[in-house]
């Protein structure tokens, strides 16, 4: 019989179940068993194997009856969510049709991870490529960011019925759903298809749930449960579960009850933290804008304020529709202060864009004299910090043309060489990467376990390269391989990598010593995602202990002080857009972090990992929550905290079974009885309402105790 998730007994049953799985894992680790389960036990980390087993075991109950249809895999970035999902896809492919939904740039990541997994599963096989082709044929890939995503899904499987749906970077899907003004967007159509699907299993992979707003939980858990588990309207959700006065969760106990059984969390266990490099405290560089830059910035702010006033009132009386954040109807037309934020990075009077000319081309045409401390104090400050780095450096900006491309020009002027690939060719066992200066970079058998590694490069040149959303996946993979080469341990091949939001997704980088975030964002999870590109399990294993550190930097443009105080009082903008974004991000981060803590407490591994605050109820077999969330809030909490304790009790045998009892004058009839629960492997109290309770009292009073 499978576990029932909407039940007070489920948390303790889960703890006992996972302990059994862990013991099995340890046995299989040492065995010579060649079964698929044993192979996965040897290939996976223990926290992966726990979820692998629970998800695929009907006894645990996923997909059974009214239980959840899947899991939110909330594992810290760099812990192997992709490997876990592929393991389940392989094991369940004879039952469910695996469909992998991810940004197109990440599809090759899945292929690489699949090959890595195959090598772990079948170390005795010499031709892993044949096994890769065999297994790959079972998978269907869909691009999350494609305009025709719906058509791709239909082509992949006809419908989502009978599918194992794996969504990577799932927070992007949740945000896309609540940012949609109607049901015509890709994200909203996928939501509706998932809600209507029958016999579907779901894996949502993300290291940063609730990154924008706690309301992201609504589409996530509604899709996992297959019903309206959480209220669809923003106002009702916030009224029920958010204390706006304290900026913290409200009715947290009732929300936890609804979420239990749908979350897997791994990330802050001590033994896992030891595998990560040390993240040093964030250095915030507040950089004063130059006079000319600040002048252009103020002009841009005037334009943005005028646009804001022109559109004000259009949506004020419109309440957010179902599954919409307030203001989603107008977000497509919002500038998000793009002008002023880009000028906060770079401003030059020499920059003019001709008709039919791309902004990136205009930046390339600028003379050397345009790239000075006056045009970008931020970048000049960043370059000074980069020169102190003993190893590879990662630079992030969400702006490509007036962010990353400008940084690239500064680097070239400083003498760095751009290794941006123009073409990747395959020639037998050799891969040739043609880069910007026209020379060839040859890599022979360039793989982590390859027998030889040969690079034809000048060791006297310091190089940088870029990965944005426009780069081809093959070129992206080659850059990642070059960065991760043992020959690049201190940046000898690629010293600096510039990435955009799209370019950064899915990157798995080693050896990085500094991360530079060129502008703040109101979503602090974005900054965590960037840092996680190089702060990963095992990413610094090849370095000596003193070098296993990563120093993050954040750059915030502040007003030119001389000009600021020359502006009439009352007309001054007290904080720059950078400062406002940073402060808003910290405020939002506090609320989002509090909700992420709730997800950790509701995770199925919480008690197994010995975490504090886990949802653990007395196993009374009562319903954990009422389907109607408003009525549920009015009802008493059925989850009575479970307290484990050793007590002195007398043994009694009744009808061939052993029980224990205490004389307890504080209880109505003077006795407390306990019976053994084989599921949780512990004794639990027998309630006075149980007919057995009276029978045991009579048995004791008759003087037949053992």
From Swiss-Prot:
Enzyme class at the top of the EC tree: hydrolase
Could you say which residues bind ATP here? Answer: 75-82
GO BP term (any one): replication fork processing
This molecule's function is given as:
Putative DNA-dependent ATPase required for providing the needed energy to achieve the termination of early transcripts.
What's the protein here called? Termination factor NPH-I homolog
Q: Where in the cell is it found?
A: Virion
Residues covered by the Helicase C-terminal domain = 417-599
